[in-house]
From Swiss-Prot:
Keyword Signal included in the entry's annotation: no
Name the UniProt record assigns to this protein: Lipoprotein-releasing system ATP-binding protein LolD
Gene that produces this protein: lolD
EC top class, as a word: translocase
Entry-linked Gene3D superfamilies: P-loop containing nucleotide triphosphate hydrolases (3.40.50.300)
Keywords associated with the record: ATP-binding, Cell inner membrane, Cell membrane, Membrane, Nucleotide-binding, Translocase, Transport
Pfam families attached to this UniProt entry: ABC_tran
Amino acid sequence: MVLKASGLTKRFHEGPIDLTVLHGVDLQVHAGETLAIVGASGSGKSTLLHLMGGLDAPTSGQVELMGQTLSALSAAEQGNLRNLHLGFVYQFHHLLPEFSALDNVAMPLWIRRQTPAQSAQTATNMLAIVGLKDRIHHRPSELSGGERQRVAIARALVTQPACVLADEPTGNLDRSTADGVFELMLQLARDFGTAFVLVTHDETLATRCGRRFGLVSGRLSEWG
């Protein structure tokens, strides 16, 4: 098992307001599977993804990544584990505008202290896999929306993580481009054996994943 959430509850306190966003969520993610979490805006989808990625701490419950309980680790240990085993894709690509596609994809490898030559070769190969071999020296402003998301996917996969967490990865794309980007993620999951957890409000796209869950008022249930 790659990722496991047990009894995740998240509450926010703002003055007199006590808001429970997630109620005792349980979820298991296995190697190589594609899993969609569908819900309306404000249902807690992004909060759940942040908790599972170790980007925030639950009020109660726990998350296990590759068999290790995140709450039992120091912040530095959590960061190292996350960098080794997780990739992230967001609705907004978060590419650095002053860097080329190649440099954006290579950056996680630089953080791992790979040599510039090794990083460039690995990033070039990954960009070719996502269909951008002729665009590696273009900056984000010189790429289309779909191309920018492909760069973001390449960046998430370049370290060969066990799981990619994707938060509305096609939310800013038109239907045709969204279909292409979504199919690319499914194909890469098959090719690399990487698990993908995709948060989306789009039920049509979600039906193409191996497992589907609905999140309503902070409660998660699996669809048949």
